C-alpha cells in the first residue's frame, strides 16, 4: 500500500522555555512561560512542564494563565537565542539527510528513505538525532516515525516529552481504526463537533463513509478527511518549501450578524496569530496583513494592506471596512486573520538599506 518512504517528524519539547531553562538552571523546576507580562495583555507562546501541570498552555491569554498559576514566572522571550538553537538543530538534521522541511523554529519533517546512517533504520536515526541534539544543545526532542507525513506528526506527540513513537506500514490500519479524528492535523474543535454529531469519532468510522457524502457535506475538507482516514497522504517532504504566509481563523458554531461579535473574535484570534508568526519569523517583519470573512452562503472575501509589522488596530479597521462593504446582510460563519511574509530577497534588500 505504501511506497518505501521513511519520514521522521521532530518536535522540540517546549522549545522556547527549554532554551531559557538551559541558560538559567534556576528556572528549571519552577513554572515559567514565554510571552506577555503582568502589566500588559498578551498570549502565552510556550510553557514549561511545571507550568502545564497548572493548566497553562500555548496560545492562552496571559491573564488566564496567571489565574491558573499566580506564581508563574513570565519571560519576554529571546528570539535570537531561539533562532541560534534552531539553526544548530537544523545542521544536525543535515548530517543525516538533505531532505528537510522546516515547519517552524522547533519542528521539521525529515525524509530518511535513502539515508545510509544507522543501517537505514529510521527508528535508529530518530533516536540518534534526539541524542545528538541533547549532547550538543542540552535540549530534548520528541520524534515520530511513519510512512506518511501526517502520521509522523501525530506519532511525535505520542510519547512527549523526550520520547518517540514508530508506526510501521504494517501497523497503519490498526492504528487508524481507533485514531480520534481530532488528532488529524487540520481538524479543529468545530469540525470535530460536527463530525461527532454525525457519529464520526475515529478514522475507522470515516472509513465506512461514502466519499460523495463527505464531499457534499464538507467540500475539499471532506476529501482530505477521507484520505487521512485511509492513511493516504501524498505530500512529499519538500526541502524547497518556503513559507509564504501565516494565518489563524475560526469557524463559528452559529453565524454571527453583528460587528461587535466579529470584533470580539478578532481580539481572541490576534494573540494566536502573533504567537504563530513569532515561531516562524521572530522579528515579526511582514509584507502584508489581511482579513478573511466567509458568509452563510459559503462565499468568502479577503482584504489586505501593505504593512511592515503586525498591527492589530489596522486589522480591526480592515475587518470593519470589509464587514460594512461586502457583507450585504449575510451572516458570517468564519473570521480569519493572516499575514504574507516578506520574500527573502526583498528582506535582504531592506536590511542592506538600513
Curated annotation (Swiss-Prot):
Q: Which HAMAP family does the entry mention? A: DNApol_IV
Q: Which UniProt keywords apply?
A: Cytoplasm, DNA damage, DNA repair, DNA replication, DNA-binding, DNA-directed DNA polymerase, Magnesium, Metal-binding, Mutator protein, Nucleotidyltransferase, Transferase
EC number(s) given by UniProt: 2.7.7.7
Recorded GO CC terms:
cytosol
Q: Which residues form the active site?
A: 107
Localization of this protein? Cytoplasm
* UniProt gene name: dinB
Q: How is the cofactor bound here?
A: Binds 2 magnesium ions per subunit.
Subunit architecture: Monomer.
Principal place of residence:
cytoplasm
Q: Which domain of life is it from?
A: Bacteria
Q: Does the keyword Nucleotidyltransferase apply?
A: yes
Residues the record annotates as the site (Substrate discrimination) are 16
Q: What is this protein called?
A: DNA polymerase IV
Q: Read off the Pfam families from this record.
A: IMS, IMS_C, IMS_HHH_1
**Which segments constitute the UmuC domain?**
7-188
Q: Which InterPro entries match?
A: DNA/RNA_pol_sf, DNA_pol_Y-fam_lit_finger_sf, DNA_pol_Y-fam_little_finger, DNA_polymerase-Y, DNApol_IV, IMS_HHH_1, Rev_trsase/Diguanyl_cyclase, UmuC
GO terms (BP aspect): DNA-templated DNA replication; error-prone translesion synthesis; SOS response
Q: What does this protein do?
A: Poorly processive, error-prone DNA polymerase involved in untargeted mutagenesis. Copies undamaged DNA at stalled replication forks, which arise in vivo from mismatched or misaligned primer ends. These misaligned primers can be extended by PolIV. Exhibits no 3'-5' exonuclease (proofreading) activity. May be involved in translesional synthesis, in conjunction with the beta clamp from PolIII.
Similarity-based family: Belongs to the DNA polymerase type-Y family.
Residues reported to bind Mg(2+): 11, 106
According to the record, the segments passing through the membrane are none
A GO molecular function annotation here is: DNA-directed DNA polymerase activity
Amino acid at each position: 500500500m505504501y511506497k518505501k518512504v521513511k519520514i521522521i517528524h521532530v518536535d522540540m519539547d517546549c522549545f522556547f522555555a527549554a532554551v531559557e531553562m538551559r541558560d538559567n538552571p534556576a528556572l528549571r523546576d519552577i513554572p515559567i512561560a514565554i510571552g506577555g507580562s503582568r502589566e500588559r495583555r498578551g498570549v502565552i507562546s510556550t510553557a514549561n512542564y511545571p507550568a502545564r501541570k497548572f493548566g497553562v498552555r500555548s496560545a492562552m491569554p496571559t491573564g488566564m494563565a496567571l489565574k491558573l498559576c499566580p506564581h508563574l514566572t513570565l519571560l519576554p522571550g529571546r528570539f535570537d537565542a531561539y533562532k541560534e538553537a534552531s539553526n544548530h538543530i537544523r545542521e544536525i538534521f543535515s548530517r543525516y539527510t538533505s531532505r528537510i522541511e522546516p515547519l517552524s523554529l522547533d519542528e521539521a519533517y525529515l525524509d530518511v528513505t535513502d539515508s545510509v546512517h544507522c543501517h537505514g533504520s529510521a527508528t535508529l536515526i530518530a533516536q540518534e538525532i534526539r541524542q545528538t541534539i541533547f549532547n550538543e544543545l542540552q535540549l530534548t526532542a520528541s520524534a515520530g516515525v511513519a510512512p506518511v507525513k501526517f502520521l509522523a506528526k501525530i506519532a511525535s506527540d505520542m510519547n512527549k516529552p523526550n520520547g518517540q513513537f514508530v508506526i510501521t506500514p504494517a501497523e497503519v490500519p490498526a492504528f487508524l481504526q481507533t485514531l480520534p479524528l481530532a488528532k488529524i492535523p487540520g481538524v479543529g474543535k468545530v469540525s470535530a463537533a460536527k463530525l461527532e454529531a454525525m457519529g464520526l469519532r475515529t478514522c475507522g468510522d470515516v472509513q465506512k463513509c461514502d466519499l460523495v457524502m463527505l464531499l457534499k457535506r464538507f467540500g475539499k475538507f471532506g476529501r482530505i478527511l477521507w484520505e487521512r482516514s485511509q492513511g493516504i497522504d501524498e505530500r512529499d517532504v519538500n526541502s524547497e518549501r518556503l513559507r509564504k504566509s501565516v494565518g489563524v481563523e475560526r469557524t463559528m458554531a452559529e453565524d454571527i450578524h453583528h460587528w461587535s461579535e466579529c470584533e470580539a473574535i478578532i481580539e481572541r484570534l490576534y494573540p494566536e496569530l502573533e504567537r504563530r508568526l513569532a515561531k516562524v519569523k521572530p522579528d515579526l517583519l511582514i509584507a502584508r496583513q489581511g482579513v478573511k470573512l466567509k458568509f452563510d452562503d459559503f462565499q468568502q472575501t479577503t482584504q489586505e494592506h501593505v504593512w511592515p509589522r503586525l498591527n492589530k488596530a489596522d486589522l480591526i479597521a480592515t475587518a470593519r471596512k470589509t464587514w460594512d462593504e461586502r457583507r450585504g446582510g449575510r451572516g458570517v460563519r468564519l473570521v480569519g486573520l493572516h499575514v504574507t511574509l516578506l520574500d527573502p530577497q526583498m528582506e535582504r534588500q531592506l536590511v542592506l538599506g538600513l
